[in-house]
């Protein structure tokens, strides 16, 4: 029987009992939360009728997938799931109410049932908890789950309208209030606000709960769980973990933590951060690992339990459980793993004595924080420019004012919309919403500034961070003051209190102190307001007015500040600085000097922050001495003539300013500075003349080599340092390299002449080496991909390494010979395709055999740190290091060649790689695989007789496409991989194309590279410098078990021999016990031979020709940038060719989707029917299947695309694959396979097991060594 939830006679007792009871348990042990509800519901395989039940059998909309309705239509199913989790060891179960708000239920037309759904769900959970409590004698608790809803307050659903929102704060509060009522009436013990991807939504939920607790419901313990979406450590709306904690701490949660989106391993650093910044208990319920390529969760119960036990052993958690993909099996093992672990001990205080604010990022104001600049220019009353923009409705331009304030150093941004001609609440809402769309601005907290409390509330309802309210006062009496303060506390904001009471504005020192002291005690004693969230403004008033009574205003503020800080612990002091100098408006130099002097003294007395024009504050010591003394006299009232003297000073000094520096002013510097500037900025225009000028200075640079070793290398060192610090980007570095090559190219003839003269004179030439070291780079034998390698070469060259680039398809003996001939310090190997991994192992073995003891670097798309540590490093006794990308290569090479660092660095690498090997071998033991026979039985099943029969292609055989129109392909280019080549990656919310252009860090450079790409594309296409060729083919096909047999057009498959066979690999890694996913193989999507239904399979191969020749020409001309650009564009055109041709196949050539109407964005999201998997990729990882394609369609003869010995395609800008028309076909990853499938596959292909293991090495689920 559920407790009396609306019993108001003893609300404090109920609160105390529940909170204290849970608190007592948490102090003794780690509690366990349940696992995924959706995961378990999927296991039940419920259909539409189950979801509808009898009550909703005639409902107008489909209900399948609306899991929450099952608490009404299938309560026994939900009850049983709850009970399984409880018996598995869960102390707390969550109600089945993740989407039980009227907002989320509107999608199903059931918004009117929100209250009932919550009450029923709570009742079902309550029944299960009480039954298991009686059964086991261990008290179980029910947490009412309040999900995030499917709408967000911080992100616009419209790209074109960043200020638009499809939900309001008040609507969310109403929805959460209705949901919470149902949960409370149904008997929950805890209210859990979970899976928070937008903190503003969570703040609305907290507001709703507080409303209920104030009305009639006894308070319940509140748990809050956020969701960090990726390794950036931010929520979907862009807030950091600490920012999130600060934003919701006003809700006084008993527990706070994270769930969903990440697995335990990925979640750990963010749980650690949260634990360090909260005094609440910490809860953690991650997913069962990260979702794989197809959305499944692969982490086994034991793996997940191990991770969470590590959390517990390290004192990070108080409550653990599971989210997506987790089951009672996971919870059972987790409960067992943590049962003897000590719980985390929450700190007694977190950032004691600090004012904690947040925008997207946290901002802490502590005892040692310097003066805080609150940007003043976003104020219609204080900035004519801003007011003009807002009045004209030009909010986007007004946003630039805010951005400049932040860039100039504002740590908090004041926003004021108080003007009689404005709709204040609407203007505040629109502008705050726009700020939320700009991460560079939204990272700082806002100060919502208005004399109209309705405007203040409008602003608070838009902000996910913790704001400052500016301001309230005792002007209208205590009741009004306390009512507003109570609301501010409920919104979770700090606030400014003006020194203003019923008698008016405080101007004298004693009055300021008295008013502020009275307000402080009202807030702290009556409302329990955190003293650290109180800011007093003792009124900065105007001086220099000519009125004697105003002369002491500055002194009174400074003296009052000192006393307030000494007597009111925790409180801060702020003020509006521009008021001080209002008498001197129009004289900006005077005003700024007055502000600088005033702040110098006010800060000494304890002023913490001020509303200032960030960036326009002079340093006290930098103010002209005469002006400084005049300001001192005025502020301290030392001279009755101070105002007049300041005015006279302004008239004699004028209002001039510095001239704007002209663009080419750098040309006026010495030649060394010009050379360095040109290198850093990538400016080619003057490089030859400047290099020649330096060469002609024989006194300073007697030899051409001196110029290289001096100003040129100095410039490139700056480039390298900036790149390493993330202040320069790859395209810029490559442009710098292009300038360097031109300069060196100019000097080479002079150096060769000098060398020849020395040889004639002395008979020999002493070689001099200005480089840090020599590095041999090569793409290994059989592989033709080299963009990444070339970029690494350029970056290393920019950092004073000599790079010997051997190109592509480089055999081992050539690599080793070059290393010996050039006395290389390091060898770097690159590869894109999986067979290249074996070639890298071979090179390492040969280096060991020949006793070549120099470091070996491994890189390329197919490589990984794990493969390097497990498969390559053990074969070679010198350092073997995996290098992720160009930006890491310089650091690695520098440490390997530093005599003082290299030994220690190598030891660290050896230890790290040994740990990786141990983890790898342990994971092999933990992985479980279905026997192949069982995996086949659990494969994807289709009712071929009832499904629509396969469509016959418009032709059988092949069709070749010569000289394909490149212009048609431009719109199909996917630009994201293009930017990846240049290592340009935007941060949330500016990831991907075209949003990357908005990114503050890389956006400008991305736009330049994109423009360069389009210019080059236009040239390549208009001048026909590239050619595209391809082939498409179709044949009758039938599946037999895991293989696909192809037949001649006239053949009867049941009686004929196949003309070709494509061999398939099937998923074997055991899936979660709750998963209903089949174990896929590509053959599942082709009609079986025994079905009697005729099916078809297609194939294609396309390529862009001429890329290598153009790239080489650019390289020979010293233009690395264009060399890399043309290769990147060649790859994009080839992929675009594959995309466009597949569209034609679906609509015309095979015509199984003749009416398809998809745009390019839809194609990228894979919204088309059918698939085009490629051999060597996840759905069929075996590259040898290409041999069958090439033979069947005579691809090399018809297109010129050939296969290397490692089965890479040449040219490198090529794509090939198979076409499946089955409307239910999907992309999947085969994943790891076990030995029985390898043996079976070898037998079917009639090759040795060893040969199969060679080609399938990366997906083997066992160790072959």
From Swiss-Prot:
Domain-level remarks: Modular enzyme with four functionally distinct domains. The isolated Hcy-binding domain catalyzes methyl transfer from free methylcobalamin to homocysteine. The Hcy-binding domain in association with the pterin-binding domain catalyzes the methylation of cob(I)alamin by methyltetrahydrofolate and the methylation of homocysteine. The B12-binding domain binds the cofactor. The AdoMet activation domain binds S-adenosyl-L-methionine. Under aerobic conditions cob(I)alamin can be converted to inactive cob(II)alamin.
Domain B12-binding N-terminal: 662-759
A GO biological process held by the record: cellular response to nitric oxide
Enzyme class: transferase
Family annotation (InterPro entries): Cbl-bd_cap, Cobalamin-bd, Cobalamin-bd_sf, Dihydropteroate_synth-like_sf, HCY_dom, HCY_dom_sf, Met_Synthase/Corrinoid, Met_synthase_B12-bd
Full protein name: Methionine synthase
Tissue specificity annotation: Widely expressed. Expressed at the highest levels in pancreas, heart, brain, skeletal muscle and placenta. Expressed at lower levels in lung, liver and kidney.
Annotated residues for binding of (6S)-5,6,7,8-tetrahydrofolate: 382-384, 449, 470, 537, 579, 585, 591
Note describing how the cofactor binds: Binds 1 zinc ion per subunit.
Pathway assigned to this chain's UniProt record: Amino-acid biosynthesis; L-methionine biosynthesis via de novo pathway; L-methionine from L-homocysteine (MetH route): step 1/1
Domain B12-binding: 772-907
Residues engaged in binding Zn(2+): 260, 323-324
Cofactor(s) needed by this chain: methylcob(III)alamin; Zn(2+)
Organism: Homo sapiens
Clinical condition linked: Homocystinuria-megaloblastic anemia, cblG type: An autosomal recessive inborn error of metabolism resulting from defects in the cobalamin-dependent pathway that converts homocysteine to methionine. It causes delayed psychomotor development, megaloblastic anemia, homocystinuria, and hypomethioninemia.
Location within or outside the cell: Cytoplasm
Superkingdom of the organism of origin: Eukaryota
Residues given in the record as methylcob(III)alamin binding sites: 709, 782-786, 830, 834, 886
Domain AdoMet activation: 923-1265
Primary residence: cytoplasm
Reactions catalysed: (6S)-5-methyl-5,6,7,8-tetrahydrofolate + L-homocysteine = (6S)-5,6,7,8-tetrahydrofolate + L-methionine
MF terms (GO), sorted A to Z: cobalamin binding; methionine synthase activity; zinc ion binding
Its EC number(s): 2.1.1.13
């Amino acid at each position: 029987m559920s407790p009396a939830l609306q019993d108001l006679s003893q609300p404090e007792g109920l609160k105390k009992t529940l909170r204290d009871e849970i608190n007592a348990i948490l102090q003794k042990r780690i509690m366990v939360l349940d696992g995924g509800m959706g995961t378990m519901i999927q296991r039940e395989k419920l259909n539409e009728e189950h979801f509808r039940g009898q009550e909703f059998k005639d409902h107008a909309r489909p209900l399948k997938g609306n899991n929450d309705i099952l608490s009404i239509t299938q309560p026994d199913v939900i009850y049983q799931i709850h009970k399984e989790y409880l018996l598995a060891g869960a102390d707390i179960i969550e109600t089945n109410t993740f989407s039980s708000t009227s907002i989320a239920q509107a999608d199903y037309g059931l918004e009117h049932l929100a209250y009932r759904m919550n009450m029923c769900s709570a009742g079902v959970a309550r029944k299960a908890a009480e039954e298991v409590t009686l059964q086991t004698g261990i008290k179980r608790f029910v947490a009412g789950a309040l999900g995030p809803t499917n709408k967000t307050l911080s992100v616009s659903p419209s790209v074109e309208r960043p200020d638009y929102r499809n939900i309001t704060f008040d609507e969310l509060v109403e929805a959460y209030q209705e949901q919470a009522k149902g949960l409370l009436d149904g008997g929950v013990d805890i209210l859990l606000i979970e899976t928070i991807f937008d903190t503003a939504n969570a703040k609305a939920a907290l507001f709703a709960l507080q409303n209920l607790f104030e009305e009639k419901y006894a308070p319940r313990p509140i748990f809050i769980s956020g969701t960090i979406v990726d390794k950036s450590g931010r929520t979907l709306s862009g807030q950091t973990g600490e920012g999130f904690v600060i934003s919701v701490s006003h809700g006084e949660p008993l527990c706070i933590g994270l769930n969903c989106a990440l697995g335990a391993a990925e979640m750990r650093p963010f749980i650690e951060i949260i634990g360090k910044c909260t005094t609440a208990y910490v809860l953690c319920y991650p997913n069962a690992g990260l979702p794989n390529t197809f959305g499944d969760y692969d982490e086994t119960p034991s793996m997940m339990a191990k991770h969470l036990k590590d959390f517990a052993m390290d004192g990070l958690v108080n409550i653990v459980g599971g989210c997506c993909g987790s089951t009672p099996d996971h919870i059972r093992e987790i409960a067992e793993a943590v049962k003897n672990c000590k719980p985390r001990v929450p700190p007694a205080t977190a950032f004691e004595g600090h004012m904690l604010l947040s925008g997207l990022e946290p901002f802490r104001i502590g005892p040692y924080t310097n003066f805080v600049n609150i940007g003043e220019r976003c104020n219609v009353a204080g900035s004519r420019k801003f007011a003009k923009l807002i009045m004209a409705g030009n909010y986007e331009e007004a946003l630039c004012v805010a951005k400049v304030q932040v860039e100039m150093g504002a740590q908090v941004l004041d926003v004021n919309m108080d003007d009689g001609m404005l709709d204040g609440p609407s203007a505040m809402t629109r502008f705050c919403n726009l700020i939320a769309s700009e991460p560079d601005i939204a990272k700082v907290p806002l100060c919502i500034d208005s004399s109209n409390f309705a405007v203040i509330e409008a602003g608070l309802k838009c902000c996910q961070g913790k704001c400052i309210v500016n301001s309230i006062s005792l002007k209208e009496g205590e009741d009004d003051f306390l009512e507003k303060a109570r609301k501010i506390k409920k919104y979770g904001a700090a606030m400014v209190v003006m020194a203003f009471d019923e008698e008016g504005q405080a101007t004298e020192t004693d009055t300021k102190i008295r008013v502020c002291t009275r307000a402080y005690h009202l807030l702290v004693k009556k409302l329990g307001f955190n003293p650290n969230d109180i800011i007093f403004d003792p009124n900065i008033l105007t001086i220099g007015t000519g009125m004697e009574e105003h002369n002491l205003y500055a002194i009174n503020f400074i003296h009052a500040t000192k006393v307030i800080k000494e007597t009111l612990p925790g409180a801060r002091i702020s003020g509006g600085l521009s008021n001080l100098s209002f008498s001197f408006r129009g004289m900006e130099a005077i005003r700024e000097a007055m502000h600088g002097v005033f702040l110098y003294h006010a800060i000494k007395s304890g002023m913490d922050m001020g509303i200032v024009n960030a960036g326009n504050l002079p340093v006290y010591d930098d103010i002209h001495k005469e002006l400084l003394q005049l300001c001192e006299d005025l502020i301290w009232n030392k001279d009755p003539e101070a105002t007049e003297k300041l005015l006279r000073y302004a008239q004699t000094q004028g209002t001039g300013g510095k001239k704007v520096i002209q663009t080419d002013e750098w040309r006026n510097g010495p030649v060394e500075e010009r050379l360095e500037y040109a290198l850093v900025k990538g400016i080619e225009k003057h490089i030859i003349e400047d290099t020649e000028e330096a060469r002609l200075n024989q006194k300073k640079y007697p030899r051409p080599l001196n110029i290289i070793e001096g100003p040129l290398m100095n410039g490139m060192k700056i480039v390298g340092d900036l790149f390493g610090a993330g202040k320069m980007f790859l395209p810029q570095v490559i442009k710098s390299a292009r300038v360097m090559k031109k300069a060196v190219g100019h000097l080479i003839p002079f150096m060769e002449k000098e060398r020849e003269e020395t040889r004639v004179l002395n008979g020999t030439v002493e070689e001099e080496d200005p480089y840090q070291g020599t590095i041999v780079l090569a793409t290994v034998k059989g592989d033709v991909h080299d963009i990444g390698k070339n970029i690494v070469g350029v970056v290393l060259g920019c950092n004073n390494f000599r790079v010997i680039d051997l190109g592509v398809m480089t055999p081992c003996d050539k690599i080793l010979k070059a290393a010996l001939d050039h006395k290389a310090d390091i060898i770097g190997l690159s590869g894109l395709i999986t067979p290249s991994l074996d070639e890298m192992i071979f090179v390492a073995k040969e280096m060991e055999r020949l006793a070549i003891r120099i470091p070996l670097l491994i890189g390329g798309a197919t490589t990984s740190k794990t493969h390097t540590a497990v498969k390559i490093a053990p074969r070679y006794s010198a350092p073997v290091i995996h290098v992720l990308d160009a930006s890491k290569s310089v650091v690695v090479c520098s440490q390997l060649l530093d005599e003082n660092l290299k030994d220690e660095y190598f030891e660290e690498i050896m230890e790290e790689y040994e740990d990786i090997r141990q983890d790898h071998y342990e994971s092999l033991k933990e992985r479980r695989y279905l026997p192949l026979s069982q995996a086949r039985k659990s494969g994807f099943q289709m009712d071929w007789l009832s499904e629509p029969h396969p469509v016959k292609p418009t032709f059988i055989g092949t069709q070749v496409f010569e000289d394909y129109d490149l212009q048609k392909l431009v719109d199909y280019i996917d630009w994201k991989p293009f930017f990846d080549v240049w290592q340009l990656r935007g941060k949330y919310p500016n990831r991907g194309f075209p949003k990357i252009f908005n990114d503050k860090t890389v956006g400008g450079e991305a736009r330049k590279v994109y423009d360069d790409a389009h210019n080059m594309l236009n040239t390549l296409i208009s001048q026909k410098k590239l050619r595209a060729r391809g082939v498409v083919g179709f044949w009758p096909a039938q599946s037999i078990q895991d293989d696909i047999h192809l037949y001649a057009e006239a053949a009867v498959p049941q009686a004929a021999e196949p003309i070709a066979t494509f061999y398939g690999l099937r998923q074997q890694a055991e899936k979660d016990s709750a998963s209903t996913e089949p174990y896929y193989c590509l053959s599942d999507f082709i009609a079986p031979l025994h079905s009697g239904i005729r099916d078809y399979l297609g194939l294609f191969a396309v390529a862009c020709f001429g890329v290598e020749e153009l790239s080489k020409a650019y390289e020979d001309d010293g233009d690395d940038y264009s060399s890399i650009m043309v290769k990147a564009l060649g790859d994009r055109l080839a992929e675009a060719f594959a995309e466009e041709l597949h569209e034609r196949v679906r609509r015309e050539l095979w015509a199984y989707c003749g009416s398809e109407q998809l745009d390019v964005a839809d194609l990228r999201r894979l919204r088309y029917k059918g698939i085009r998997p490629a051999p060597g990729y996840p759905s069929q990882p075996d590259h040898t299947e290409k041999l069958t394609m090439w033979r069947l369609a005579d691809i090399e003869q018809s297109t010129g695309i050939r296969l290397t010995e490692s089965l890479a395609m040449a040219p490198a800008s090529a794509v090939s694959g198979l076409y499946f028309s089955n409307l239910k076909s999907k992309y999947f990853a085969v994943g790891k396979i076990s030995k029985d499938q390898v043996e079976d596959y070898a037998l079917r292909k009639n090759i040795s097991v060893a040969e199969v293991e060679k080609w399938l090495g990366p997906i083997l689920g066992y160790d072959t060594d």
